[in-house]
Every structure is written in structure tokens, then in C-alpha cells.
Amino acid sequence: MKRKKKLDLERYTPALLTFIANKLSAGASQLYREQFDVGIVEWRVLSMLAVESNIPAQRICQVVGLDKSAVSKSVQFLQSGGYVQSQVDPEDARRYTLSLTTAGHALHDRVFDVAQERERRLLETLSPEEIESLLSMLNRIHKQIDHVNAYRP
């Protein structure tokens, strides 16, 4: 029996986005481990805490889209290295919030420079207008995720 349905992997947007993200993450993780002894998940935690300080781990999961166990494992690793500290949430004593230490900020800044160069290399074939257009489209797609994930045939 001949199959009639098959994805065009160069035109199926979810696959293309996944392939790009997977390859970028794998390359970044390898480089960051070699250079800084942190992987991509630790970098995502560091970068989130540089953007929003004193937040619960749940907030990192929500924004970055990582599962709780991956964030928890990375936070423990970063705490043991002295990069992240936890404190009781002043608004809810049952919760803890996370923030970067001085060493965490320094590590973030070193990785940030490398991440920025990787982004520059990724986008170097695009004009500034194309980059703005790409970012606009990606942000619009990102806002559709809940709508897409709510679909049940």
C-alpha cells in the first residue's frame, strides 16, 4: 500500500522550528560545557534570572518552557557552584525565590557574550529589516502556542 500523506520537513513549520532549536541547543550546550562548565538548561536559568530576579522556579518553567525536573536539577547545580541563591519569598513563606549571586552575574555575562556572537552568526545573512520581520513573526507564533496546544480533534 502506497502512503499518501507525508510531511514536507522543509515546509512543516513545527518540524522546522524544532530542528533549528534542537541543533542550536546542542551546539550551545556543547560549547557552554567546554567553555563555562554549564549546559544549555543552566544557561536558560541564568539568563532568566538576569532578566527577572527573585522569582520562583515555577516562573522559569513557565517562561522558558522547561519541565520542573530539568529546572530543579539545573538550579541545584548552579546553587552548588555558588551561582544561584534561594531565599524565602517575602510574600509567601511557603515558597522560595531564586536570584543570581555575584558569581552568577559574572558567569551570566561571560556566557552572554558568547551567546550574542552565536546569534550574530546565525542572523548574519539577514538584513536588519529581515531580522525585525523574523522576530515579529516568531513573537506572533509564540503567542499562538496556548491556542495550538488547546486543540483536541
List PLM regions with ranges.
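Short, locally clustered residues in the helix-turn-helix/winged-helix DNA-binding domain
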Residues: 21, 47-51, 112, 139
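A structural preference for long, well-packed, hydrophobic secondary-structure segments
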Residues: 22, 27, 72-74, 135, ...
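N-terminal leader segment of winged-helix/HTH proteins
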Residues: 1-36, 83
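C-terminal regulatory/oligomerization modules of transcriptional regulators
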Residues: 1-6, 129-153
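N-terminal helix-turn-helix DNA-binding core of bacterial DNA-binding proteins
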Residues: 26-70, 151-153
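Active-site phosphate/pyrophosphate-handling residues
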Residues: 12-15, 44, 121, 132
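Charged, amphipathic alpha-helical coiled-coil/dimerization segments
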Residues: 63, 76-139, 143
